[in-house]
Amino acid sequence: GKEGYPVDSRGCKVTCFFTGAGYCDKECKLKKASSGYCAWPACYCYGLPDSVPVYDNASNKCB
């Protein structure tokens, strides 16, 4: 798999600015990642399937 910042439906990073411990690990696992953590202020995932979109500065569509 790959690693990176998962994105929401708007193409924005998943924020962990106000979330508790374990939030990003849960969010990443919902996206079939092996694990994740809060790379404050956004979630970062490890072991993502190649089909899952991750944040890319070049093609960022976040509004």
Curated annotation (Swiss-Prot):
The keyword Metal-binding does not apply. InterPro entries: LCN-type_CS_alpha_beta_dom, Scorpion_toxin-like, Scorpion_toxin-like_sf, Scorpion_toxinL, Scorpion_toxinL/defensin. It comes from the Eukaryota. Gene3D superfamilies: Knottin, scorpion toxin-like. PROSITE patterns: LCN_CSAB. Residues 2-63 form the LCN-type CS-alpha/beta domain. Expressed by the venom gland. It holds the Pfam family Toxin_3. Keywords: Disulfide bond, Ion channel impairing toxin, Neurotoxin, Secreted, Toxin, Voltage-gated sodium channel impairing toxin. GO terms for cellular component: extracellular region. It is found in: Secreted. GO terms for molecular function: sodium channel inhibitor activity; toxin activity. The keyword DNA repair does not apply. CDD domains: neurotoxins_LC_scorpion. SMART domains: Knot1. Disulfide bonds join C12-C62, C16-C38, C24-C43, C28-C45. GO terms for biological process: defense response. Has the structural arrangement of an alpha-helix connected to antiparallel beta-sheets by disulfide bonds (CS-alpha/beta). Belongs to the long (4 C-C) scorpion toxin superfamily. Sodium channel inhibitor family. Beta subfamily. Beta toxins bind voltage-independently at site-4 of sodium channels (Nav) and shift the voltage of activation toward more negative potentials thereby affecting sodium channel activation and promoting spontaneous and repetitive firing. This toxin is only active against insects. This is Insect toxin TbIT-1.
